[in-house]
Amino acid sequence: MAGVPPYGMHSPTQQPRYPSYSPSTRDRQPYSGNDPYQHPPRTPPSFAPPSSLSRSPHFARPPSPMNTTLPPLNGTVVNADGSPPYHGHSGSATSGYTLPRPFGGSLMSATSHSPPPSYSHASGSHSHPSNIPDSFSQSPKRESEPYDVRSDRTGPVSQTPARPASPKESKSARSNPMSFANILSGPADEPPPRRSSPPPQTYKSSTLPPIAPTPKVDKEPLSEPEKRRGSSHYETAYNEMPHRPAMNGFTPAKSPLAAMPSPLSKSRKLVDEEEIDKISRENIARALEQIDALDNSDVEAPGFEQEWERYMAKSRKRARELDAIEGRKRKRRRTEFLGKLAKMFEKQALQGIERFNRIHEAEVQMEVQQKEIQEEKERKKDMQRKRRRENTVRHEMEKLNAAQKKANKIEDEAEKQKLAKEIARSKKKIKDTTLALERGEASQEISEVNPLAPNLEGGTTSSFHIRTKSPPPPKKRAAKGTSSRPRKSKEKKQAEKDAAEAAYAAMENEDLVPLAPKEDPRKTSLKKESKAARSKEPSPVPATPYDSKGYNQFYEQLWRDIARKDIPKVYRIKVVSLSTRQENLRKTAQLAAKQARKWQEKTNRSMKDTQARAKRTMREMMTFWRRNEREERDMRRLAQRQELELAKKAEADREANRQRRKLNFLISQTELYSHFIGRKIKTDKAQDSGDATTTAAIEGNGEGKVPDSLVPLPDGGAKVTSFDDLDFDAEDETALRQAAMANAQSAVQEAQDRARAFNGEENKMADFDEGEMNFQNPTSLGDVEVSQPKMLTCQLKEYQLKGLNWLVNLYEQGINGILADEMGLGKTVQSISVMAYLAEVHDIWGPFLVVAPSSTLHNWQQEIVKFVPDLKVLPYWGSAKDRKVLRKFWDRRNITYRKQSEFHVLVTSYQLVVGDAQYFQKIKWQYMILDEAQAIKSSQSSRWKSLLGMHCRNRLLLTGTPIQNNMQELWALLHFIMPTLFDSHDEFSEWFSKDIESHAQSNTKLNEDQLKRLHMILKPFMLRRIKKHVQKELGDKVEKDVFCDLTYRQRAYYTSLRNRVSIMDLIEKAAIGDDTDSTTLMNLVMQFRKVCNHPDLFERAETTSPFSVCYFAETASFVREGPFVDVGYSTRNLVEYDLPRLLCSPEGRLDVAGPGNNKAGFEGRYLSHLMNIWTPENIRESMSHNDAFSWLRFADTSVGEAYEVSHKGVFERAVRRRDYSTRLSLLDVAYDAEDGVNINSVHVHSLFNIVERNDRRALADITATGYMRELLNVASNVAERGGIRTIEPCAKPGASAPPITISCSGQAAIAEARATFFNTAVRHALFAAPTKAMEEEILSNKLDPAPYSLRPLLPQPGSMKGRYTNITVPSMRRFVTDSGKLAKLDELLRELKNGGHRVLLYFQMTRMIDLMEEYLTYRNYKYCRLDGSTKLEDRRDTVSDFQQRPEIFVFLLSTRAGGLGINLTAADTVIFYDSDWNPTIDSQAMDRAHRLGQTKQVTVYRLITRGTIEERIRKRALQKEEVQRVVISGGAAGGVDFNARSRENRTKDIAMWLADDEQAEILEQKEKEALEKGEELGAKKGRKAAGKRKRDITLDDMYHEGEGHFEDNSTKPSGAATPVSGDVSGVPGVKGRRGRGGGGVGRSKKAKTMKERLRLVDGEVD
C-alpha cells in the first residue's frame, strides 16, 4: 500500500510529532543487516481524524517527513512500484508500540548466520518488512499488542490479512532486475514511471464544492474473507474504507460518511439483511427529499465573503508557518535518524566486509595468482606468436626477392606466370602477417549468429558480432516468434507425417525406400497410396503369419544380409549426403552474412578510416617531436661529454707528465746509486761466466751510456731534498736531476755510516778512506779479490768463488743483496762461505741468523757442520720450554762473537722468528740469511714487517725464483733489502707491477729503454746465474709435454660440470669482483682438475658382495674376547627346522638302545645278528652249495670281508678302499702283447672282466687332446699361462646363505651336531687336514709326516679357485683405463722401468697420491712417499732411503712439500702428473733432481689433458716464465706476449680457463670491442661501494689440500713444519685471538678452513 495512513484526530495546530512508520507490504529481497534487532522503532498509525476536520478547508496535508527519493544506503535498487523506501512515522509524540528488544530471545534468530523468520516475506525495497496493516490505528495510551513470531511473519497477534494486489497493478519491468529491458538499459536510465494515479484536484478558496446527494447503494452479501475481517477487533467502517492512491506522498482524508461509525455496526449479525437494506433506502430517500426542499444552505448564504477570504488567508499563513517549523524539525530529526542509521549500516558493512575478506581471502589470492600466471603465459604466447610472424615475414621477403630475381632472368612465359603467382602469394602472406603484427592479434573472422531478441525500441540490434576466442553466449528464446528457425505450418507437419508413414508402409511391403529428393514424385505417390489405403481400409484385418521352419530361416537370412550389407551402405550414403548438405548450407550462410554486412562496412569504413588516419598522423607527429627532442638532447650530452673528455685528457696528460717526471727522478736516483755500487762490487764480473750471449747483451746495454766519471755531480754539501718537497709540475728537470744526485750520494753515505756504526770501535771498515767513497772515483774500491776461506772443507767452483767475492763486497759496502742463482747451483755453500770468510779474515764469528723453511732446517744444520766444522750451530726449534732453554746461550752483551762463544750460527724457521720476534730484535745480528726468500714476497704480511725490524748489519736473500707471479713480488724483495732507496712509493710500485705487465696486454713489444733501466737497477742488488751458463758438466734438462685424452667417463663428468654452470655468467660476475664468486670459481677449477686427474676422486668404485641372508655372531664387547676372536661356523640361516626335543633324543630313535627304548636291543639282536644273512656261517654254507653268495669268488672277496662290509657304512668303506689298488694294470706287464694287437687274458681273474686292464682314472687325465681337454682343464691352463692360481668367476650370486639346519632345544642334539661337524677322523679323511694334536705328536716324536699325509677323499672345491669368496673388489685394470693420464703413465712407467730409470712423481693433490699408491701396489713397483703429512724425522729418512736404495723405482711427492731443500739426484726422470699454475713451483720441484751431483740427463715429463683447463693453465704458466726471462735474465723483449691481467681481473682470468677455445676467442673479441668503446666487459653501471675485502683465497690453498705449510705462510701447525714436540701455542707474543683474523678455537660456522671447505664441496662432510 502506497503512502501513509491518515493523521490522528488533532487540530491543525496539533500536528503529530512523528509520522507513523508503515513500510510497504511488497515482497522484499533479503539483505545483510535486516535482522529484527536492527529495525528502527516502528510506531502504529494513529486513529483517523473526524470527518469534519478531514473535510475542513483549513486542514492542510503536510508533506511526508521522509524523503520519498532517498537513495538506499547499501546500494540496492529502489522499490519497483515507486513507493518511497522510507515512509513517514506517526505523528504521536510517544510511540504506541514498545521498541523491539535487540537482544531478546523472542526476536533473535536461531544462529548468527541464518536469516531471521521474517526473511520468508522479504521486501524488494530498503524498508524493513512489516505485516501490520496500513490502516491500523491505536490510541497512544493503549498498550501495544504482543508480537507473533512465526516462521513467515512478525506482527500483532490479531491482524487483518494484507490486501491482495489489484489485478490492474502489474509488476513493472523495473521490479525484475534480470528482465531484458533492465539488462539493455544503462545504470543512468530514468526510473520507470509510477503506476497511474488520478490527476490532482484543485480546490477553490471562495466557494465550497456542493455536496452530492447520497447515492443508493445496494449492498451485496459479505464474502467469507469480509466476514472474517469484520470479526476482528478493528472497526468495520475503517476496515472497509476504500483505499485511494497517494498523491504527492500524502494519503487523502476519508470521506465523512466513511469516517462516521455506522449505527448498525454493532447489530449487524442480529438484523436481517433485507431489513437493513430497506432502512437504508428509506433514510437515503428521506435525506434527499430534505435537501431538495431547502432553498439555500448555510454555507451558500451571502454576506460572509470578506470574512471567508480573511479566514482563508490566515489559515494559509498559519499552515505555511507550521509547515516551515515542521519542516525544520523534520529535517533535523531526519538528519539525526539518518546519521544513526548510516553509522549502524556502516558498522554492519565493515563487519560484513571483514567477514567476507576473512572467508574469501585465500580464494582470492589463489585466483589472483592463477590470473597472473595465466596472463604471463598469454604474454609469452603473444611474444612467440609475434616472433613467428616476424620470421614468416622475413622468410617470405627472402622468397619474394628470390622469385623476383629468378623471374627477371627467366624468359619462359609459363615459368614467369608461375613465379608471378608465387610472388603474389608471398605478397599477400606478407601483407596479412604485417597487418596481424600491427593489430597485435589474429584476424577475427565474422561468425554467423542468431538474430537477437527485439530491444526496447521494438527493433532488433543492428550490430554484428565478431567471432572471438570466448565461447558464444547461450541462446535465449526470442519473444514474439522471432526465432532463428521458422515455425512449421500444420500442412507441412502433416506432410512430414505422411512421408514417414509412406516410408514405413514401403518397408512393410519389403521394398527399399529410394533416396529421393525433397519433391520426388515417388514420395508423393507413396503418400497418396497410403492415404487411399488408410481411407479404404480404416481398420486392416490382422493377417495370420505363415509359419514354417524353412520360411523362418530364409527370412532371418535375408534380414542378416540386409543388416550386414545394405544398411551400412545406406547409412554411409545418408551421412555423406547430410554432411555435404550441411557444408553447403554453412557456406551459403557465411556468404549471405558477408553480403548483409557490406552496407554497414561501407558506412562505418569511412569514419573508421578517418579516425585511423588521424590517430596515425598524431602518432607520427608525436614520434617525430620526441625523436627530435631526443636527438637534440643527445647532441647536447655528446657535446658536454666531449668537453669533459677533452678536459680529462688534458688533466691526464698533465698527470702523466708529472708521474713521468716523478718516475724519472726515482729511476735516476736509483741508477746513480746502482752505477756506483755496481762498479764497486763487480756484479757484471760475477755474472760474466763465459757465456758470450750474456756478455754481448750486457755490453750492448751499455752502449750510448755516459761514463760515470763524466757525470756532473753536486758538491758534497748538497742538500738532500725530500720526495714530498719536490716540484714535479715544472717543465725544467734540472732541479730534479740535481736532487736525484744529492739523494743518491746521501744514500751511499748513509749506508756506509750505518755499516761503520754497527760495530762501533771494532768495525773493520774504519780502515777505508772516507774520501774515496764518492762519485768522483767510482772504481777505487772494487779491487778487493777474495780467495776461498781455508776453514771451508769443500772446493768452490769458479762461479761460486765469484759469487763469494760479490757477497763480500756487498758486506764491506754495507749493502744488502739478493742471491738469485738458479736452483742447484750452490746458494747454500756460497752463503756458508761468506760466514767462513768473516770468521777467518775479520774474526767475526757471529752472531749469524739463518731463517729457512722448516723443511730445510736439518739440511742447513748438516751443511754448516759438514762444510765449516769450526762454526757452532744452534738449532732453534722445539717447544716453548726448549726454546727458553736455548735462549740462555745467547750473548746479548757482545755485539761480535768470538770463536769461544757458545754458538755462532742460529738456524730457525720463519714461523718461530715471527713468534719470538721480541727476543730476536734484542740481539744485533751480524748477518741475516733468508733462505727461500719468496716467503716474504708480500710486503703487507706480518712476517715481512717482523723481519724488516730485525737489527742486523747485512741481509742476504736466497731465492731461485725472485719473480713467481708478478713484478710486485720482486719489488717487495727490493724494498726489503733497501727500505730507504726502494721506498714504498705508489709510482715506483706501479712502474714495476703495472707498467711492464699492462704494456704486454696489447701484445706489443716492451719498451726497450725501460727494460734497460730496469736491468741496470737490479744489477747491483741481485746476482742471477743459470745452470747452462756456469755448469758445463751438468747434464741437460729435457722437458716434454705429454698430451692425454679424456676417457668416456672423464668426458661425461667434464661435460656434466660444464653444463651445470654458465661460463658467460661466471665471467660477468667475475668482472664485478665479488669474493663469493672468486671462491666459487676456484672451487670449479678444483673440480675440473679432479676430473682431469682421475674420476675416482669424485666417486670410488664400491666393493660388492652377495646379500647375506643369515644371522651373524654377536658379542657384548670385543675387548673381553681377546686379541683374536674365532667365529667359525657362527652364521645361521634365517630358515630353521624346529624339531621337538623327543625326536632328537635317544628315546625318540628306534636304532639307539637306551633305558627309554626297549625295542632297540631286541631288533639289534634278532634282526641284525640272528636273522642276518651276512653272517660268516651263512655265507660259507651258501658258497659251498653254489647258492646266493657264490659270486664272491669272482669278486676276490673273502667271507670276513663281506661280513665286515655289510656292517659298515659308506664312509667307512670309502676310507677302507682308499688304500687299496687294483691289480688289473699288473696284467699288462705280465702279458705283453705286440703293438696294435689286443690279446685278452683267459685267466680266472679276468674271465668276467669287461674293461681294460687299467686302473680307473679321472676323465681329465684320459683326454689328452681336443676341445674336451681344454674344457676339463681350465684351471690348470690358467695357472700355466697366467701365473696365478685364481680364476675370476663369470657371475656372482645375488645372495648367499649357510645351509638350513635343525633347531632343537635339547643338549643331546647340540652334542650330536658338534660330534658330526667336528669329527676329527672324518675331517682328516675328507680334507687330509691333520689335527693339532697329530701335528704336535709328529713334531715331538720327530716322525716322517708322509705316511700321515694321505690323499683327501674329496677334491678341491670350485670356490677355492676364486679364493673361497664371492666378494668383488673393483678391477684395477678398469681403475687404470678410467683415466687418460693414468693409462699414459702406465705405459710410460713400463718403459722407464725397462730402461733402468728412477722417477720422481709430483702431484698437486694428496688424494691423488693415495690412488697412485694403489696403482703402484697393483703393478708391484717399489715406491716411497713424501707429502705434507710426513713428519720431519720420517722425511729425512725417506729421502735417504731413496738416495741409497736403487730398488726403489718411484718417489711420490707433493709439489709444495717435495719442492724445497731436497737433494734427489738419484732420480733422472721427473713426471708432473698435474702442473702447478705457478711455473716457479714446478721449476723448484724438477731441480730437486737437476742439480749439482747429477751425472745423467734429466728428462721432465708433464702430463696435460688435451682440450681442458689444464692446457690453458699451462699456457698461462709459460707466459709467466717469459716474464722472468725478460725481466731477470736480460733477454730480448721482442715479441713477448705477457697476456697479463691486473689484480682486479684475476678472477676473470680464472673464469677464462673454464671456457673452451671458441668461447675464449669470442670473449676476447668482445673485450676488445668494449675497451675500444671505453667500457669494460660485463661491468655494471651501478656498482656497490666495495667494503672491506676478505682475505684473498689463492689457488695455492685450493690445490694443496692436506699438505703442510712448508713455506710457513701462516701460524697453523703442520706435521712437516718446525719440529715442535710441545705446544706451539706457548710461543710468546702469539696468543690465540678470537674473532676475525684469530686462529683461536672459537671459529664460527662461516669461518671454515680451506680443507673443510674443499671437503664440503667434494661431498665428504655430512
UniProtKB/Swiss-Prot annotation:
Sequence ranges of Basic and acidic residues compositional bias: 140-153, 216-229, 390-399, 408-425, 517-537, 1592-1610, 1649-1662
UniProt superkingdom: Eukaryota
Pro residues: compositionally biased ranges: 38-48
One Pfam family recorded for the sequence: Helicase_C
Residue ranges annotated for the Helicase ATP-binding domain, each copy included: 808-980
Enzyme class (EC, first level): hydrolase
Coiled coil (residue ranges): 356-439, 581-671
Record field: transmembrane: none
Database matches in PROSITE patterns: DBINO, HELICASE_ATP_BIND_1, HELICASE_CTER
Gene Ontology CC annotations of this record: Ino80 complex
The entry's keywords: Activator, ATP-binding, Coiled coil, DNA damage, DNA repair, DNA-binding, Hydrolase, Nucleotide-binding, Nucleus, Transcription, Transcription regulation
Recorded catalytic activity of this chain's protein: ATP + H2O = ADP + phosphate + H(+)
Disordered, as annotated region: 1-269, 373-548, 685-710, 1574-1662
EC number: 3.6.4.-
Sequence ranges of Basic residues compositional bias: 474-491, 1580-1591
A Gene Ontology BP annotation from the UniProt entry: regulation of macromolecule metabolic process
Subcellular location: Nucleus
Oligomer and partners: Component of the INO80 chromatin-remodeling complex.
Domain-related comment: The DBINO region is involved in binding to DNA.
Protein name per Swiss-Prot or TrEMBL: Chromatin-remodeling ATPase INO80
